[in-house]
């Protein structure tokens, strides 16, 4: 799994606004990625402070995502690359846990992001662009978040 991230830590609000796609555009974006030759699963998380694309594919899939993101946002490819953080494998999964747990949020610990992630997953699932790997990752994040809150509530 890969995660291509542009967030409040790497970009300004002008850049982030260009990457905050409405649902119609998200659907087309996901379709363009999913029907490319090198991506088997994908979802996009857009909030006011981040746009992240989680995807499964080979090494060439990274350039595909960067290119499609550049095309959809209208941000020059080389300019966009300045704002991107790329995570792969275990680091991508760890990043997903950190994002969902609010650790990567502007206000550390806020929990609205988990709901946004669940909606992004449901949107991708409804559009047929997620399968086993991303499903397992999002389910693990949701379960861990629930267990952490239950445990903390009982302290």
Language model: regions and residue ranges:
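Accessory, often N-terminal, substrate/partner-engagement and coupling regions
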Residues: 55-126
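Conserved small/polar residues in nucleotide/adenosyl-binding loops
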Residues: 144-151
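Residues that scaffold, gate, or flank divalent-cation-dependent active/transport sites
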Residues: 37-40
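Interdomain hinge/lid region at the active-site interface
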Residues: 140
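Short glycine-/aliphatic-rich beta-strand segments at the starts of folded cytosolic domains
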Residues: 1-22
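Short beta-strand
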Residues: 42-47
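Short amphipathic alpha-helix segments
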Residues: 21-35
């Amino acid at each position: 799994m890969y995660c291509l991230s542009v967030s409040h830590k790497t970009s300004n609000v002008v850049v982030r606004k260009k990457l905050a796609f409405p649902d119609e555009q998200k659907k087309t974006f996901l379709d363009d990625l999913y029907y490319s030759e090198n991506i088997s699963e994908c979802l996009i998380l857009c909030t006011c402070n981040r746009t992240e694309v989680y995807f499964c594919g080979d090494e060439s899939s990274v350039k595909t995502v960067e290119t499609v993101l550049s095309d959809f946002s209208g941000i020059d490819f080389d300019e966009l690359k300045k704002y991107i953080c790329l995570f792969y494998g275990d680091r991508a999964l760890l990043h997903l846990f950190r994002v969902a747990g609010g650790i990567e949020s502007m206000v550390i610990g806020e929990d609205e992001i988990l709901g946004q992630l669940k909606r992004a997953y449901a949107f991708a699932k409804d559009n047929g662009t997620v399968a086993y790997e991303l499903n397992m990752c999002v389910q693990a994040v949701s379960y861990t978040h629930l267990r952490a809150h239950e445990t903390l509530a009982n302290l």
